[in-house]
Amino acid sequence: MKLKIKKGATVQVITGSDKGKKGTVIAVDANAMKIQVQGVKVQTHYDKKDGLLKKEGFIDYSNVKLVEAASKEKKTSKKATKSKSA
């Protein structure tokens, strides 16, 4: 299924323990309908080499709302810019 929320978009959590928090989307798993948001659902993992690591966990797509979509910069060719200025 195609999701409207893309990597780099700003979202707000609407349910759960992190309700009200805003952050940018780090990763999207469209098959599982899960997204990873910076600063939301931070989990602690233990690694023998590095010790305790804090990492964001995935949350369900339905638990967030889109605040600001990821912006795509339009790529213009050199021909298009020359013709506009002439």
Curated annotation (Swiss-Prot):
Domain of life: Bacteria
SMART domains (alphabetical): KOW
GO molecular-function terms, A-Z: rRNA binding; structural constituent of ribosome
Annotated GO CC locations: ribonucleoprotein complex; ribosome
Gene3D superfamilies with a match to the protein in the record: 2.30.30.30
Entry keyword set: Ribonucleoprotein, Ribosomal protein, RNA-binding, rRNA-binding
SUPFAM superfamilies: Translation proteins SH3-like domain
InterPro entries: KOW, Rib_uL2_dom2, Ribosomal_uL24, Ribosomal_uL24_KOW, Translation_prot_SH3-like_sf
Pfam families, per database record: KOW
Function: One of two assembly initiator proteins, it binds directly to the 5'-end of the 23S rRNA, where it nucleates assembly of the 50S subunit.
Family from the record: Belongs to the universal ribosomal protein uL24 family.
Assembly with partners or alone: Part of the 50S ribosomal subunit.
HAMAP family: Ribosomal_uL24_B
Record protein name field: Large ribosomal subunit protein uL24
Organism: Bdellovibrio bacteriovorus (strain ATCC 15356 / DSM 50701 / NCIMB 9529 / HD100)
Gene expressing this chain: rplX
